[in-house]
């Protein structure tokens, strides 16, 4: 009976892992850091994007500097950096910002899960 329960839990876990959403990250020229101001219903946010060794690291912080999301995108899959809970809307936002970088756009609005995000590139040179 115990073996049957363990097998069932393992099967459900493997099924859930197999259903993880994959993202197609655009191919970008190397860059060390890009910074964006993000307007949302949560107030002003800052997004920091780093490109290193075939992975993209995203840090989204609020006006007080507290992290809202810290994620890494590698091989089409997001993983947490730290202990913040995953947020699928932020994952989609991060991929859209990568597309914005690829298309060399400085400003764009996105609608994700009934939430409007206004993203503007910040020049930190």
Residue ranges of each PLM-predicted region?
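Post-signal-peptide N-terminal segment of Sec-exported extracytoplasmic proteins
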Residues: 37-71
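Short, low-complexity, disordered segments immediately C-terminal to signal peptides
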Residues: 24-33
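Bacterial signal peptide processing site
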Residues: 20-22
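C-terminal motif of bacterial Sec signal peptides marking the signal peptidase cleavage site
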Residues: 16-18
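A mature extracytoplasmic/lumenal domain signature
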Residues: 60-64, 73-77, 82-86, 123
């Amino acid at each position: 009976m115990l073996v049957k329960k363990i097998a069932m839990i393992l099967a459900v876990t493997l099924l859930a892992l197999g259903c993880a959403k994959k993202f197609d990250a655009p191919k970008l020229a190397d860059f060390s850091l890009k910074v964006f101001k993000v307007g949302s219903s949560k107030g002003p946010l800052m997004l920091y994007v780093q490109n290193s060794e075939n992975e993209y690291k995203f840090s989204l912080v609020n006006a007080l500097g507290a992290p809202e999301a810290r994620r890494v995108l590698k091989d089409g899959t997001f993983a947490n950096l730290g202990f913040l809970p995953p947020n699928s809307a932020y994952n989609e936002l991060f991929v859209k910002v990568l597309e914005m970088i690829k298309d060399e756009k400085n400003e764009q609005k996105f609608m994700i899960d009934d939430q409007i995000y206004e993203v503007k590139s910040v020049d930190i040179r």
